[in-house]
Amino acid sequence: MSEVQQLYLDDLHVGQRFTSGSYLMEAARIKEFAAEFDPQPFHLDEAAAEASVFRGLAASGWHTAAVAMRLLVAGGLPFANGIIGFGGEIAWPKPTRPGDTLQVESEIIEITPSRSKPQQGIVTVRSTMFNQDREAVYLLTAKLLVLRRPRGK
């Protein structure tokens, strides 16, 4: 297994793209997450979900967001200092379903070096999580803190 390259602000450029590994969303995991964090009937029960606006079991949007974060941390955004957010916008254009295989694609859309803290900058990243049919199920535009490469590295 190869080690993921750890990137600093100095390594990044606008238009740079990253692709994560994949994750299989299972019905049992949807229900487990929902039972603890988003206990609404359409996330917990197939019959209730079928009668809902979703017309079938759907993962919580927060579960979908958590999976996206896992994929980004596991190599989808290999920033040396981790993924440290300053804010952003989220959308869920389609529900995530049991059996979906999810993958995140990200693009750097802006880099702003800090004037007051020259050792860091803010990087704006647009990430889209797709299912196996290339349907977008999660959109995130985030402002992230990224450090410059330390001297000698």
Residues covered by each model-derived region:
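HotDog/MaoC-like acyl-thioester-processing domains
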Residues: 1-14, 92-153
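Hot-dog-fold acyl-thioester-processing enzymes
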Residues: 2-87, 149-153
